A protein has these predicted regions:
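Conserved loop->alpha-helix
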Residues: 1-246
C-alpha cells in the first residue's frame, strides 16, 4: 500500500484527457510533470490532487513497450494514469480539463522524512472553497465533520494542512506563501471543489470503539492438529512383573 505525506513534489498540468472502458465512463489523463517523471516507472503510485493513481504510461510509452525500470519520462516529462467512474464521481478529478494544474506527490520511501502526516491517497469526500487562501475556508461534509479537529491534520487536494478553526459545516486552514505558490491552493477560488482526506487514525479509533475495544486483543492461532491418542506407557510395577495394563 502506498503512503504519502501531503508534501507536494510538483505542480503538474493536464496535457490531454481521453475516455477509457467499454462504456467510455473512465478517463485517461496525461500529465506534464518534468520533475516527477524523472523518478517515475510504469506501475508506480502517484497522488494526484490527493487521489492515489497508477502510472500506466511514462514518457508517452505504454507499459507493454517499457522494460522494468526504464524511465523514458526523462525525455518528455509526461506520464499518464487512468481513473474509473467511481474515482471520477467521488473526487474532483472528474472535472479536470486540459491546462488544469494538479498537485503531484510520490509515495513515502524508506528513510524519507515524514514532512506532513500519514496520507493514504483515499479521498474521503469533496468540499467547496468558501474563502480562498491564505485563510482558506472549505465546506465540510457532515459525514466527515467528526474527524476534523482544531490543530489536527487534514489533506486538501493532496496538501497536508493544520486545521485552525472548525465550524458546524466548514473548517479553515492557514496557507503559507510557499504553499500557495508551490501548489494549486493559491489558485483556488470560491466555489471550486477540493478533495478531502481526514486523518486515518481517527477513523481506525472510531471503528475500534464501535466494535467494542474493551475486549483485549488476543492473537489467534491455528487449531492444534487432531492426532490419535498415544498408548499409555506401562507403569513401573507392570514393567517389573513383565505385564502391561489392559
Amino acid at each position: 500500500m502506498a503512503v504519502f505525506t501531503g508534501i507536494v513534489l510538483e505542480m503538474g498540468a493536464v496535457e490531454s484527457v481521453s475516455t477509457t472502458g467499454d462504456s467510455g465512463s473512465g478517463r485517461r489523463f496525461e500529465f506534464a510533470a518534468p520533475t516527477l517523471a524523472r523518478k517515475l516507472n510504469v506501475g508506480d503510485s502517484v497522488a494526484v490532487n490527493g487521489c492515489c493513481l497508477t502510472a500506466v504510461e511514462v514518457g508517452g510509452s505504454p507499459a507493454a513497450e517499457l522494460g522494468t525500470g526504464l524511465r523514458s519520462g526523462l525525455a518528455t516529462g509526461r506520464w499518464s494514469a487512468d481513473a474509473v467512474d467511481e474515482t471520477l464521481s467521488r473526487t474532483n478529478l472528474g472535472g479536470l480539463e486540459v491546462g488544469d494544474a494538479v498537485n503531484l506527490e510520490l509515495p513515502l520511501g524508506i528513510g524519507d522524512v515524514l514532512g506532513g502526516h500519514l496520507v493514504q491517497g483515499h479521498v474521503d469526500g469533496v468540499g467547496r472553497v468558501l474563502d480562498p487562501a491564505p485563510d482558506l475556508r472549505v465546506s465540510l461534509p457532515a459525514s466527515l465533520a467528526r474527524y476534523v479537529v482544531e490543530k489536527g491534520s487534514v489533506t486538501v487536494d493532496g496538501v497536508s494542512l493544520t486545521v485552525v478553526v472548525v465550524g458546524d459545516d466548514s473548517f479553515a486552514v492557514a496557507v503559507i506563501t510557499h504553499t500557495m505558490g508551490a501548489t494549486t491552493l493559491g489558485r483556488r477560488v470560491a466555489g471550486e471543489l477540493v478533495n478531502l482526506e481526514v486523518d486515518v487514525i481517527a477513523k481506525y479509533v472510531e471503528r475500534l470503539l464501535s466494535a467494542g475495544a474493551t475486549t483485549p486483543y488476543l492473537p489467534t492461532t491455528p487449531d492444534a492438529p487432531t492426532t490419535p491418542d498415544a498408548p499409555t506407557p506401562p507403569s513401573a510395577a507392570a514393567r517389573a512383573t513383565g505385564s502391561s495394563p489392559r
